């Protein structure tokens, strides 16, 4: 694994803690956290990230709106995005992927699956322009 910066966005401190703990198994990751989409946008505007992992249902700004705004930002058009949510419907999944998410994972999260998806999205061979 190589050095990469990840932003984890979820309004649940417990879920953020779980995700951060799981991702710490991957060497070289620097992990930042945000509690909602508005806070995430502020961090994205001041820091360069290699991966965004976001919940959907959050106050202030939901994850789908966040994904759409990030995809419209020239600096982040190719940023890998994982949506993590309790919403398991195909409609929500298709909507998230349609607006630009690369992956859609449902809660409760399986640590091994999360790590595999993150590894795959951060693979330098996949990220070449």
Regions found by a protein language model. Name each.
Residues 3-14, 19-23, 52:
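Conserved acidic segment of CheY-like receiver
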Residues 33-51, 94:
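Acidic, metal-coordinating helix/loop segments flanking the phosphotransfer/catalytic sites
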Residues 48-50, 75-80:
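His-Asp phosphorelay/catalytic-motif detector in bacterial-type signaling
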Residues 58:
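Receiver (REC) domain active-site loop signature in two-component systems and cognate sites
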Residues 109-118:
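C-terminal output helix
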